[in-house]
Swiss-Prot record:
Active site, UniProt feature: 156, 256
Residues making up the signal peptide according to the UniProt record: none
Protein name: Aspartate-semialdehyde dehydrogenase
NCBIfam families according to UniProt: asd_EA, PRK08664.1
Purpose of the protein: Catalyzes the NADPH-dependent formation of L-aspartate 4-semialdehyde (L-ASA) by the reductive dephosphorylation of 4-phospho-L-aspartate. Mediates the second step in the biosynthesis of amino acids that derive from aspartate (the aspartate family of amino acids), including methioinine and threonine, the latter of which is a precursor to isoleucine.
SMART domains with a match to the protein in the record: Semialdhyde_dh (SM00859)
CDD domains reported in the protein's UniProt record: ASADH_C_arch_fung_like (cd18130), ScASADH_like_N (cd02315)
One biological process term in Gene Ontology: lysine biosynthetic process via diaminopimelate
Family, per entry: Belongs to the aspartate-semialdehyde dehydrogenase family.
Length: 365
């Protein structure tokens, strides 16, 4: 274990917390030592406190960890803490941890809108972590203690949406109009109450509370440039990009599918083949940094007319890769395509772990 960074997980008994634990088990750079949950779980061995619902077995390395309350005093030894807390509780707890000088990577929505809190999809906008670097450098220059910080993981469906947009914008310039219709897996709703089986079997639910709004504004923050002083990010304006989302829950276990149409600002627009080549050639910065979990192929361009499909394609690059298919011209905008991403890996806990790997590679933890 020598040389590993000490990690903790908040909300360890929940759906996202369990996924964090799976991804951190036997990780080459992080040692999971502290687990936080509610007061009714505190004091118990993790194996006795959790109702384990992952398809993979509970890692032995986590079974005997004694669960702590979600208070910073129990996490002082941690170099990084991953938060899988529900938004109802995350705000106050994560703020207390940050004020105690602890680094937090959060899956909750509470601080995503804050201009000085990076909202990160690690295969898309790791440069926004310069906000953290600037904060640490400023404190050091002023002779102050090392500050804590919060980094937010994006909404699960936003992660899949922005992944192909980043290389296209870098290559062909701004996208000024974008529509997406999602087909989202039931795992995105978490455990009980989640989505009742009687509601989703033989059915599609054309509503996910708050999801469409999150996709529309998060896209405008993730794709926005850093401020010149690297202290914050402002959302792109409606004049710069218009985003419209419609979100549906479908009877799929894992993997969010999105039907996207987009328009480039610059004329003439690229060709279909140029778009495909751009996506195939994209290499994310996390891979260039040598991060353990980074996908070797960030975007998999599929030529089969009936792909991507969740069951067949969600686990590409261990769930960190994004699959894109059916790329073709759109008679209303410029192009349309189908995008698939693993909602609990690159769309949630896996994104958090890859963010931490980038922080480590940049000596920010």
């Amino acid at each position: 274990m020598a040389g590993k960074k000490i990690a903790g997980v908040l909300g360890a008994t929940g759906s996202v917390g369990q996924r964090f634990i799976l991804l951190l088990a036997n990780h080459p750079h992080f040692e999971l030592k502290v687990l936080g949950a509610s007061s009714r779980s505190a004091g118990k061995k993790y194996v006795d406190a959790v109702n384990w619902k992952q398809t993979d077995l509970l890692p032995e390395s986590a079974t005997d960890i004694i669960v702590s309350e979600c208070k910073s005093e129990f996490f002082k030894e941690c170099d990084i803490v991953f938060s899988g807390l529900d938004a109802d509780y995350a705000g106050a707890i994560e703020k207390e941890f940050m004020e105690a000088g602890i680094a937090i990577v959060s899956n909750a929505k509470n601080y995503r809108r804050e201009q000085d809190v990076p909202l990160i999809v690690p295969v898309v906008n790791p440069e926004h972590l310069d906000i953290v670097a600037q904060k640490l450098d400023t404190a050091k220059a002023q002779g102050k203690p090392r500050p804590g910080f919060i980094i937010c993981i994006s909404n699960c469906s936003t992660a899949g949406l922005v992944a192909p947009l980043k290389p296209l914008i870098e290559k062909f310039g701004p996208i000024d109009a974008l529509t997406t219709t999602t087909l989202q897996a039931i795992s995105g709703a978490g455990f009980s109450p989640g989505v009742p089986g009687i509601d989703i079997l033989d059915n599609i639910i054309p509503y996910i509370g708050g999801e469409e709004d999150k996709m529309e504004w998060e896209t405008k923050k993730i794709l926005a440039p850093l401020a010149e002083d690297k202290t914050h990010v402002k959302l792109l304006t409606p004049e710069e990009i218009k985003v419209s989302a419609q979100c549906n829950r479908v009877a799929v276990s894992d993997g969010h599918t999105e039907c996207i149409s987009l328009r480039f600002k610059n004329r003439p627009a690229p060709s279909v083949e140029q778009v495909k080549t751009c996506l195939k050639e994209y290499v994310c910065d996390a891979y260039k940094l040598g991060c353990h979990s980074a996908p070797k192929q960030t975007i998999h361009v599929l030529e089969q007319p009936d792909r991507p499909q969740p069951r067949l394609d969600r686990n590409r690059d261990s769930g960190y890769g994004v699959s894109v298919g059916r790329i073709r011209e759109d008679p209303l905008l410029d192009f349309k395509m189908v995008v698939l991403s693993h909602n609990t890996i690159i769309g949630a806990a896996g994104s958090g772990v890859l963010i931490a790997e980038i922080l480590l590679a940049r000596n920010l933890i």
